[in-house]
Amino acid sequence: LAVCVSLIGAANIPPQHLNLYQFKEMIRYTIPCEKTWLEYTDYGCYCGYGGSGTPVDALDRCCYVHDNCYGDAEKKHKCNPKMQLYSYKLTKRTIICYGAAGTCERIVCDCDRTAALCFGNSEYIERHKNIDTKRYCR
């Protein structure tokens, strides 16, 4: 399984988008080279904005778990996951999160790390891209 590594810097990314940029980079590191991270933004019932119903497959479950992880970070730890910056390293086909355990930096990084690794280990089923969520996600 080939892995793509991005060398793009974050210097010109506005601060309000840096966490999503970091998550995107994690995803790009773990998914097959023939896929782009954008293919994961409207997949199943949970990959992308919002989510409802039962996940359609293992990949969609990765997004469901990620959504819940962000929800827990907000409710239990008073974090703002979409704005939270964190330190991490992409190395040897895995992702290492830095920061003290229990801090928002570490909690959010762990959410993104877990999801990205899950994406890399889950089959991408083309028919679950852009599904009719009103019909399949109840």
From Swiss-Prot:
Any idea of its EC number? 3.1.1.4
For this UniProt record, the keywords arranged alphabetically read as follows: Calcium, Disulfide bond, Hydrolase, Lipid degradation, Lipid metabolism, Metal-binding, Neurotoxin, Presynaptic neurotoxin, Secreted, Signal, Toxin
Residues given in the record as Ca(2+) binding sites: Y46, G48, G50, D67
Q: Which GO terms describe its molecular function?
A: calcium ion binding; calcium-dependent phospholipase A2 activity; phospholipid binding; toxin activity
Q: Which PROSITE patterns match?
A: PA2_ASP, PA2_HIS
Q: Which reaction does it catalyse?
A: a 1,2-diacyl-sn-glycero-3-phosphocholine + H2O = a 1-acyl-sn-glycero-3-phosphocholine + a fatty acid + H(+)
Active site at H66, D112
**Can you supply one Gene Ontology CC term for this chain's record?**
extracellular region
Cofactor(s) recorded for this entry are: Ca(2+)
Give start-end of the signal peptide. 1-10
Q: Which cysteines are joined by disulfide bonds?
A: C45-C137, C47-C63, C62-C118, C69-C111, C79-C104, C97-C109
What are the GO BP annotations of this UniProt entry?
arachidonate secretion; lipid catabolic process; phospholipid metabolic process
Q: What class does this enzyme belong to in the EC scheme? A: hydrolase
Its chief place of residence is secreted
Where's it found, cell-wise?
Secreted
Tell me yes or no: is Lipid metabolism among this UniProt entry's keywords. yes
Entry-linked InterPro entries: PLipase_A2, PLipase_A2_Asp_AS, PLipase_A2_dom, PLipase_A2_dom_sf, PLipase_A2_His_AS
- Return the cofactor note field: Binds 1 Ca(2+) ion.
Please describe the quaternary structure of this protein: Heterodimer; disulfide-linked. The A chains have phospholipase A2 activity and the B chains show homology with the basic protease inhibitors.
What is stated as this protein's family in its record?
A: Belongs to the phospholipase A2 family. Group I subfamily. D49 sub-subfamily.
- Which PANTHER family does the entry mention? PHOSPHOLIPASE A2, PHOSPHOLIPASE A2 FAMILY MEMBER
Provide the protein name. Basic phospholipase A2 beta-bungarotoxin A-AL3 chain
